[in-house]
């Protein structure tokens, strides 16, 4: 793929080149690595040791304001009664007909602050369009956040080494504010690999290559490898990809996402009436 100025480079771009990236695709208008040492070697490291890579193309959407929770409940059909601060939830965004706009990981970082980590698409424009006429007191923007994903059975050991055990008790689909040698980030026990995973949501893109290098050096103690998103393992894990496996022509029920819909909750949401039928 040609490299140009119209597509955004991630904060880890130079590190990708340094460690042998073999190609890129475009995802959320950013360059996303497609390979390093080959799919088989990367797969074996993913299921046996520990891997990490550039997932900055998961461009975050931040929702702030007194009505942030109400807005998040309005744009998707999952019941968020138990979404406390520090919780992460897998969600789908639906249109007025119940069609799926995209899927995403939702992080609640504060009482009135959420991040939405979507699949490929223009989700931020959809949300900003809804917000204009919602009457809700919120702001929506893209923050300076760039995820780096760590995955594999030894990923917990790598996190323990990097953070001196500080996040050993971090629960599944939980997130915490943290830092690594002065590099600010949110750490979440989330991922898109089918293996034990963590995501480091870097909060200063100028420090991307510094973070990549620190993770690389620590990972060598666990036979770590730099990888790209591994399609083989996501298929095995039953993980669906928006745009490839499903799209707006599908509703949650047709692809087995019933658990992400609660039409009996009192809260109104986009597509509720359509999904009741």
Label for each model-derived stretch:
Residues 1-91, 99:
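Acidic, proline/glycine-enriched N-terminal capping motif
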Residues 59-64, 95, 105, 115-119:
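Short secondary-structure transition/capping motifs
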Residues 66-100, 155-183:
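Internal amphipathic helical hairpin motif
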Residues 1-34, 106-277:
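Conserved, structured C-terminal
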Residues 54, 103, 199:
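Acidic active-site catalytic centers that drive phospho-/nucleotidyl reactions
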Residues 39-48, 93-103, 132-135, 179-187:
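Short amphipathic beta-strand starts and helix->beta connectors
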